[in-house]
Amino acid sequence: MGTVWHAWDPSLQRDVAIKEVLLPAGMSPKERAEARARTLREAKATARISDTAVVTVHDVLEHDDSPWIVMELLRGTSLQHHLDRNGPMPVERVEEAAKALLGGLRAAHAAGVTHRDVKPANIMLTDDDRTVLTDFGI
C-alpha cells in the first residue's frame, strides 16, 4: 500500500520513482515500528535482486515516520491497466511476458526473496517492451 511519485535524483542526475509506504491508521506505536522495520527489511532484500524483469531498488529511507523506497522509474502501464483498456494480449506477447516474469521470479528466489503479491497490477509493461515485476508485497 502506498503512493508512488515521479522524482528527480539530484545526486545522480536521473529520474526515479519514490514510493511512500502508507501504514494503516490506528496502529499502535509497536505495530508501526514493526511495520516500518519489515518494510525496510523487505526493500533491502528486493535491492539484492538484479534482473531486467524486476524493478531496481536504489535506496530505502524513513522520513516523517514513514518508510520511502527509491526505485528505478518505469515508463509504461501496469498489465492490469493494459488488460482493462485493451483486453487480452496476443499469444506471442503473453509468452514473452511469461518468460520475463519467470526469469524475474527465478532471480528473486536466487536472492532469497519471495514475491508475495504477483498480480496484473504489480506487473509493468514498459514503453521499451520490458515486462517488470514491482511491489514485492511491501
PLM regions and their residue ranges:
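Conserved N-lobe ATP-binding subsite of Hanks-type protein kinase domains
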Residues: 3
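Conserved N-lobe loop of protein kinases adjacent to the ATP-binding glycine-rich P-loop
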Residues: 8-16
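AlphaC helix of the eukaryotic protein kinase fold
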Residues: 22-48
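Activation-segment/catalytic-loop signature of the eukaryotic protein kinase fold
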Residues: 60
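Conserved short submotifs of the Hanks-type protein kinase catalytic core
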Residues: 64-78, 82
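Activation segment signature within eukaryotic-like protein kinase domains
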Residues: 97-98
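Protein kinase catalytic-loop region centered on the HRD/HxD motif
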Residues: 101-113
